[in-house]
Amino acid sequence: MKVIISGGGTGGHVYPGIAIADVLKQKNAENQILFVGAGGKMEMSQVPAAGYPIVGLPIRGINRKLKYIWKNLALPIWVLISLWKVKRIIKDFKPNVVIGTGGYAGFPTIYMAARMHIPIVLQEQNAYAGVANRLLAKYAHKICVAYEGMDAYFPSNKVVLTGNPVRAFLTDKADNYLPSLQYFGLEPGIITVLVLGGSLGAQAISESIIKAAHIFEKHTIQVILSTGNAYFSTIQQADFPAFNKNFKILPYIERMDLAFAAANIVVSRAGAISIAEIASAQKPAIFIPSPNVTADHQMKNVLPLVTKNAAILIKDNEVPDKLVPAILELAKDKQRQRMLVENLSSCFKTHAAESIASLIEDLV
């Protein structure tokens, strides 16, 4: 079986595709998989690192900021060039099925596959369906979703509740606690907080955590902070307090398996895949929805969890005042940590990648 997986721009669209690809290869090593993404975006490095070939398209997303709205004038040209290029890719590769994981990067691929009468499966991660998937839904044979009620956006006869696919290491329950601490140079027996700003970073979160370094040291809490590449150089140049040896600042975490193994508490943006990965890793979490996303969809992802006592919510504008106190309070409350883990785990289906892979096999 030949499969094209297309989508990207952020980790939330890239990592589900990799998780699905991994299961398809496990099911049959003869399966051939090709990724198609947006040139210059993170998928162009992350997909090859996972062992799969990828082709980049010259596609660009819509710029919604008024002062940059003029940049959208060239968008039709990039779309046409991408459609022409992806038509050649499909003709040469001859896929049996095309999978779309969302984001503008997948739009030309899915649209052209539909025009060429190739079966299509879409995977929607969020509680609020993305623009690309809503536009492409009419071409899809099946639409795999993670939240109930998604027939509000898609034809109900196409919707399949599978959950969000997560990378395989998150379902591996091997005891990596001590190796993970050694990897990051941290001490055992101390509360470890993993802070993730999302694949594109989050400056307000990073700055609040760094400015509280002396507070964490006082409370014997160690921190792993992933700033994102965009903010790492800014943080390096800023005049922040000196950090103790148990404060690790990284632009990007290559070994997320070890980061989750080390963590007692996770602070994260509320992207759908981030939430699913934290649930699979069985960690108590504080979520800070990004205000810079379409239709405030990260808030929509996390609100159902808050109502079920499965997550702690802090709004982005509350970060300077509320984030550090919330971390300190949760670090002291073992019972609440256990409750959050149990409730979050119960909110999501497991083995989503396996379910989607089986659906793809049945479709072909």
Curated annotation (Swiss-Prot):
> What Gene Ontology cellular component terms go with this record?
plasma membrane
The pathway that the record names for this protein is: Cell wall biogenesis; peptidoglycan biosynthesis
* Record flagged with keyword Chaperone: no
| Entry membrane topology | Peripheral membrane protein
The entry lists its GO molecular-function terms as: UDP-N-acetyl-D-glucosamine:N-acetylmuramoyl-L-alanyl-D-glutamyl-meso-2,6-diaminopimelyl-D-alanyl-D-alanine-diphosphoundecaprenol 4-beta-N-acetylglucosaminlytransferase activity; undecaprenyldiphospho-muramoylpentapeptide beta-N-acetylglucosaminyltransferase activity
Question: Any stretches that span the bilayer, and where are they?
Answer: none
Q: Which UniProt keywords apply?
A: Cell cycle, Cell division, Cell inner membrane, Cell membrane, Cell shape, Cell wall biogenesis/degradation, Glycosyltransferase, Membrane, Peptidoglycan synthesis, Transferase
Entry's localization field:
Cell inner membrane
Which Gene Ontology biological process is one annotated for this entry?
carbohydrate metabolic process
Primary location group: membrane
Catalytic activity, as annotated: di-trans,octa-cis-undecaprenyl diphospho-N-acetyl-alpha-D-muramoyl-L-alanyl-D-glutamyl-meso-2,6-diaminopimeloyl-D-alanyl-D-alanine + UDP-N-acetyl-alpha-D-glucosamine = di-trans,octa-cis-undecaprenyl diphospho-[N-acetyl-alpha-D-glucosaminyl-(1->4)]-N-acetyl-alpha-D-muramoyl-L-alanyl-D-glutamyl-meso-2,6-diaminopimeloyl-D-alanyl-D-alanine + UDP + H(+)
Residues involved in UDP-N-acetyl-alpha-D-glucosamine binding: 10-12, 126, 167, 199, 253, 298
Enzyme Commission number? 2.4.1.227
Which protein family is it in?
Belongs to the glycosyltransferase 28 family. MurG subfamily.
Function comment: Cell wall formation. Catalyzes the transfer of a GlcNAc subunit on undecaprenyl-pyrophosphoryl-MurNAc-pentapeptide (lipid intermediate I) to form undecaprenyl-pyrophosphoryl-MurNAc-(pentapeptide)GlcNAc (lipid intermediate II).
Q: Which PANTHER family match?
A: GLYCOSYLTRANSFERASE, UDP-N-ACETYLGLUCOSAMINE--N-ACETYLMURAMYL-(PENTAPEPTIDE) PYROPHOSPHORYL-UNDECAPRENOL N-ACETYLGLUCOSAMINE TRANSFERASE 1
Name listed for the protein in its UniProt record: UDP-N-acetylglucosamine--N-acetylmuramyl-(pentapeptide) pyrophosphoryl-undecaprenol N-acetylglucosamine transferase
